[in-house]
Structures are given as structure tokens and as C-alpha cells.
Amino acid sequence: MIKQVLSVIAGLAFAIPAPAFATGFEDISRLKELVSGSGTKVLLQNCTESGIYGYYEYNQSTNVDTLVICSNTVDRKDPDAVWETLAHEATHAMQACAGGPIVDDVLVPRMLRELQEFTPHYYRILMKYSSSQKRFELEAFWMELRHPKFVIDTFTKFCYTRD
């Protein structure tokens, strides 16, 4: 009986997102340092594509990956706006380090429900992605909702710690 109760409590703890607030620019600086330290260029620049806040790309010819935060769409004075974009794009860097998805398949339905319930606008955006990109974007949107320590620890796990 106790195991069943603990199992339910653990499931609920996963389902309820932590506030997606960076404690300030310290968390942003820490994650940016980690991303840069992993070999990814982190840039702040104007983006010409409408409606995007940032992007992550890998250039095969130069073997360099780049994380861009769009200075013309992200309010750099708002740590939450910067954090959400950085956490999202850093998730794509984590996926590159891992060579694929970073969250166990069994958790995907919970992640989808969480987005649908707590951030329906993210869920609607996610549904517009192609099936080949949906899983990667799901993880990135979901990671925006996590506590900064979780994001930082997860980045360290995938991009600095090798078993």
C-alpha cells in the first residue's frame, strides 16, 4: 500500500511543472557558460525569420553548432523570456550531445499532457511540427517549464558526463 501511495505521489510530482522562472540572470549566465563550454557558439543576433525567438543549428561542413537568441524578438531585460529561449535551444544542444532524444519514451505521454494542460499555446505550436521533429520540440518546450537547476543538471549530464 505504501509503495502504491508513493508511486502516485511521485507521478504527481512529475506532472506538476516547477515554475519556469530563472532566479535571475545568474541561472542564464550559468547555462550559457555550460553551453559555450561544450563547444557550442552562443550568439545574440537579429533574426530575419518572423516569429522565432531563437534557434539551434549544426553546420556539418565546419563541424560547429550554434545557439542563437534573437535580439529583435526576445526581451533581454526579462530574465524569464531569455531563460525560456535559452533553455529551449540548449535542449537541442543536449539532444545533439546525446545523439537523439534525452527523455525516456515512457514519459512522452506525460510530457504531452503537461504541455496541453499547463501551456496550451506550446501544445498548439508543437502540433504544427512535422512528425520527425515533434519529439525533439516536445522535449525543448517541456524543458522550458523545468526549474533552472534541472535544466543545468540535465545539460551537464548529457554534454559533460559520459558513462
Model-derived regions: residue spans:
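Hydrophobic beta-strand residues in large extracellular and virion-surface proteins
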Residues: V42, L67-I69, L86
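Active-site scaffold of zinc-dependent metalloenzymes
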Residues: C47-D80, A96-C97
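Short alpha-helix carrying the canonical HExxH Zn2+-binding catalytic motif
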Residues: D78-M94
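Cleaved targeting-peptide boundary
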Residues: A20-R30
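Positively charged n-region of N-terminal signal peptides that target proteins for export
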Residues: M1-V5
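Metalloprotease/metallohydrolase-associated module, dominated by Zn2+-dependent proteases
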Residues: K32, S38-L44, D104-D163
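Catalytic Zn2+-binding segment of zinc metalloproteases
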Residues: A90-L107
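Bacterial N-terminal signal peptides
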Residues: S7-P17
